[in-house]
Amino acid sequence: MAKLAICILVFALFALALSARVPREESNPAQEFLTKAQGDFNEFIEKLKALDAKKVEGLFKDGLNTVQEGLQKLNETFLQAPAAST
């Protein structure tokens, strides 16, 4: 009878020791990256929804003006540079 009680006690302690382990949830870098990318993508979509034809036209004109000014400065730089003699 005592042997049976000791076996049950050992089994109970063993079960208690195994159930006391709490698994730790480790952070997953890939999941964090995907969550951030999804948030950025959703923010980008919201910004696209806010654009209308006038805003797009204004952005296009601003971009075109910037490119033209850059090309003009580049052209002036080339015209001012002395030609290399061969």
Curated annotation (Swiss-Prot):
GO MF, one annotated term: neuropeptide hormone activity
Protein induction: By bacterial infection (at protein level).
Tissues in which the UniProt entry reports expression: Hemolymph (at protein level).
Keywords, sorted A to Z: Neuropeptide, Secreted, Signal
GO biological process: humoral immune response; neuropeptide signaling pathway
Predominant subcellular localization, coarse grouping: secreted
Residue stretch(es) of the prosequence: 20-34, 45-86
Subcellular localization(s) per the UniProt record: Secreted
GO cellular component: extracellular region; extracellular space
Signal peptide segment: 1-19
Protein name per the record: Neuropeptide-like 2
Organism of this sequence: Drosophila melanogaster (Fruit fly)
Lineage, opening ranks: Eukaryota, Metazoa, Ecdysozoa, Arthropoda, Hexapoda
Name of the gene this protein is made from: Nplp2
